[in-house]
Amino acid sequence: MKQRTFTMLKPDAVKRRLTGEILTRFEKRGLKVIAAKTLMISEDLAKTHYGEHSDKPFFNDLISYITSGPVFAMVLEGDDVISLVRKMVGATNPKEADIGTIRGDYGIDTGRNIVHASDSEESAQREINLFFDETEFCDYELPDEDIIYEEP
Protein backbone atom coordinates (compact mmCIF):
# COMPACT_ATOMS: atom_id res chain seq x y z
CA MET A 1 0.00 0.00 0.00
CA LYS A 2 1.44 3.36 -1.04
CA GLN A 3 1.85 5.70 1.95
CA ARG A 4 3.52 8.94 2.93
CA THR A 5 5.70 9.51 5.98
CA PHE A 6 7.53 12.38 7.60
CA THR A 7 11.26 12.02 8.14
CA MET A 8 13.63 14.63 9.52
CA LEU A 9 17.41 14.64 9.62
CA LYS A 10 18.36 16.29 12.88
CA PRO A 11 21.03 18.96 13.43
CA ASP A 12 23.78 16.39 14.03
CA ALA A 13 23.14 14.80 10.62
CA VAL A 14 23.07 18.15 8.79
CA LYS A 15 26.15 19.53 10.57
CA ARG A 16 28.08 16.32 9.86
CA ARG A 17 27.19 16.59 6.14
CA LEU A 18 25.27 13.29 6.10
CA THR A 19 22.14 14.59 4.34
CA GLY A 20 23.04 13.36 0.85
CA GLU A 21 24.25 9.98 2.02
CA ILE A 22 21.10 9.31 4.06
CA LEU A 23 18.82 10.61 1.31
CA THR A 24 20.55 8.24 -1.12
CA ARG A 25 19.72 5.29 1.16
CA PHE A 26 16.02 6.13 0.99
CA GLU A 27 16.08 6.58 -2.78
CA LYS A 28 17.98 3.34 -3.35
CA ARG A 29 15.16 1.52 -1.51
CA GLY A 30 12.73 2.85 -4.10
CA LEU A 31 11.25 5.61 -1.95
CA LYS A 32 10.19 8.85 -3.56
CA VAL A 33 10.99 12.26 -2.01
CA ILE A 34 7.88 14.33 -2.70
CA ALA A 35 8.76 17.31 -0.47
CA ALA A 36 11.96 18.43 1.25
CA LYS A 37 13.48 21.51 2.83
CA THR A 38 16.23 22.66 5.14
CA LEU A 39 15.04 24.86 7.99
CA MET A 40 15.70 26.11 11.49
CA ILE A 41 12.93 24.88 13.77
CA SER A 42 11.44 27.49 16.08
CA GLU A 43 11.01 26.66 19.75
CA ASP A 44 7.21 26.74 19.32
CA LEU A 45 7.30 24.30 16.39
CA ALA A 46 9.69 22.02 18.30
CA LYS A 47 7.40 21.97 21.35
CA THR A 48 4.38 21.19 19.18
CA HIS A 49 6.22 18.49 17.24
CA TYR A 50 7.57 16.78 20.37
CA GLY A 51 4.55 17.58 22.57
CA GLU A 52 4.03 13.91 23.47
CA HIS A 53 7.31 14.07 25.42
CA SER A 54 6.51 17.29 27.34
CA ASP A 55 6.28 15.48 30.68
CA LYS A 56 9.54 13.57 30.22
CA PRO A 57 12.77 14.65 31.97
CA PHE A 58 14.64 14.97 28.65
CA PHE A 59 12.08 17.32 27.02
CA ASN A 60 13.97 20.60 27.53
CA ASP A 61 17.23 19.08 26.28
CA LEU A 62 15.40 17.70 23.23
CA ILE A 63 13.96 21.14 22.41
CA SER A 64 17.37 22.79 22.86
CA TYR A 65 19.02 20.21 20.64
CA ILE A 66 16.47 20.22 17.79
CA THR A 67 16.56 24.03 17.64
CA SER A 68 20.39 24.19 17.81
CA GLY A 69 20.95 23.98 14.07
CA PRO A 70 19.33 23.27 10.73
CA VAL A 71 17.25 20.18 10.06
CA PHE A 72 16.36 18.57 6.74
CA ALA A 73 12.65 17.73 6.71
CA MET A 74 11.14 15.52 4.04
CA VAL A 75 8.06 13.63 3.01
CA LEU A 76 8.78 10.19 1.60
CA GLU A 77 6.30 8.15 -0.39
CA GLY A 78 6.32 4.44 -1.11
CA ASP A 79 4.88 1.04 -0.44
CA ASP A 80 4.43 0.55 3.33
CA VAL A 81 6.86 3.47 3.74
CA ILE A 82 6.26 4.08 7.46
CA SER A 83 7.35 0.58 8.45
CA LEU A 84 10.20 0.51 5.93
CA VAL A 85 11.68 3.83 7.05
CA ARG A 86 11.45 2.80 10.72
CA LYS A 87 13.42 -0.37 9.89
CA MET A 88 16.01 1.61 7.93
CA VAL A 89 16.38 4.15 10.76
CA GLY A 90 16.94 1.54 13.50
CA ALA A 91 16.55 1.61 17.28
CA THR A 92 16.28 4.97 19.07
CA ASN A 93 19.52 4.32 20.93
CA PRO A 94 22.30 4.06 18.32
CA LYS A 95 24.24 1.71 20.61
CA GLU A 96 21.34 -0.76 20.32
CA ALA A 97 20.69 -0.16 16.61
CA ASP A 98 21.80 -2.80 14.13
CA ILE A 99 24.81 -2.10 11.94
CA GLY A 100 23.48 -1.15 8.53
CA THR A 101 20.69 1.02 9.92
CA ILE A 102 21.06 4.80 9.78
CA ARG A 103 21.35 5.16 13.55
CA GLY A 104 23.55 2.09 13.84
CA ASP A 105 25.98 3.52 11.29
CA TYR A 106 25.92 7.23 12.18
CA GLY A 107 24.24 7.80 15.55
CA ILE A 108 26.23 8.96 18.56
CA ASP A 109 23.81 8.57 21.47
CA THR A 110 20.09 8.67 22.19
CA GLY A 111 20.13 12.47 22.30
CA ARG A 112 21.96 12.77 18.98
CA ASN A 113 20.52 9.92 16.98
CA ILE A 114 20.58 11.51 13.51
CA VAL A 115 16.98 11.14 12.37
CA HIS A 116 13.31 11.33 13.29
CA ALA A 117 10.79 9.08 11.53
CA SER A 118 7.02 8.97 12.04
CA ASP A 119 5.87 5.87 13.90
CA SER A 120 2.28 5.59 12.59
CA GLU A 121 -0.04 6.87 9.87
CA GLU A 122 -1.60 9.30 12.36
CA SER A 123 1.80 10.66 13.44
CA ALA A 124 2.95 10.90 9.83
CA GLN A 125 -0.08 12.96 8.81
CA ARG A 126 0.19 15.24 11.85
CA GLU A 127 3.92 15.82 11.33
CA ILE A 128 3.59 16.35 7.58
CA ASN A 129 0.92 18.98 8.26
CA LEU A 130 3.15 20.69 10.84
CA PHE A 131 6.09 21.08 8.48
CA PHE A 132 4.62 21.21 4.97
CA ASP A 133 1.83 22.79 2.98
CA GLU A 134 0.15 20.75 0.21
CA THR A 135 1.56 23.21 -2.35
CA GLU A 136 5.08 22.02 -1.47
CA PHE A 137 4.47 18.45 -2.68
CA CYS A 138 5.78 17.33 -6.07
CA ASP A 139 3.85 14.51 -7.68
CA TYR A 140 5.91 12.65 -10.27
CA GLU A 141 6.40 9.16 -11.62
CA LEU A 142 9.54 7.09 -11.14
CA PRO A 143 10.64 5.03 -14.15
CA ASP A 144 10.06 1.75 -12.28
CA GLU A 145 6.90 2.78 -10.43
CA ASP A 146 4.59 0.80 -12.72
CA ILE A 147 6.52 -2.36 -11.83
CA ILE A 148 6.68 -1.61 -8.08
CA TYR A 149 2.94 -0.94 -7.77
CA GLU A 150 1.76 -3.49 -10.32
CA GLU A 151 -1.26 -5.45 -9.12
CA PRO A 152 -0.56 -9.22 -8.91
Curated annotation (Swiss-Prot):
Which InterPro entries does the record match to this protein? NDK-like_dom, NDK-like_dom_sf, Nucleoside_diP_kinase, Nucleoside_diP_kinase_AS
Q: Name one GO cellular component term.
A: cytoplasm
GO BP terms: namely:
CTP biosynthetic process; GTP biosynthetic process; UTP biosynthetic process
Q: Where in the cell is it found?
A: Cytoplasm
Reaction(s) catalyzed by this protein?
Answer: a 2'-deoxyribonucleoside 5'-diphosphate + ATP = a 2'-deoxyribonucleoside 5'-triphosphate + ADP; a ribonucleoside 5'-diphosphate + ATP = a ribonucleoside 5'-triphosphate + ADP
As cofactor, the record names: Mg(2+)
Alphabetized UniProt keyword annotations? ATP-binding, Cytoplasm, Kinase, Magnesium, Metal-binding, Nucleotide metabolism, Nucleotide-binding, Phosphoprotein, Transferase
Q: What is its main location?
A: cytoplasm
What is the enzyme's class at the highest EC level?
transferase
Which CDD domains does the record cross-reference, listed alphabetically? NDPk_I
Query: Which molecular function GO terms apply here?
Result: ATP binding; metal ion binding; nucleoside diphosphate kinase activity
Q: Where does the chain bind ATP?
A: 10, 58, 86, 92, 103, 113
Catalytic residues per the record? 116 (pros-phosphohistidine intermediate)
Note the PROSITE patterns from the entry. NDPK (PS00469), NDPK_LIKE (PS51374)
Check the record and name the SUPFAM superfamilies matching this protein.
Nucleoside diphosphate kinase, NDK (SSF54919)
Documented EC number(s): 2.7.4.6
Q: Which domain of life is it from?
A: Archaea
- Assigned protein family: Belongs to the NDK family.
State its role.
Major role in the synthesis of nucleoside triphosphates other than ATP. The ATP gamma phosphate is transferred to the NDP beta phosphate via a ping-pong mechanism, using a phosphorylated active-site intermediate.
The protein's matches in NCBIfam families, at most eight in alphabetical order, are given as:
PRK00668.1
Protein known as: Nucleoside diphosphate kinase
| Organism encoding this protein | Methanosphaera stadtmanae (strain ATCC 43021 / DSM 3091 / JCM 11832 / MCB-3)
Record gene name: ndk
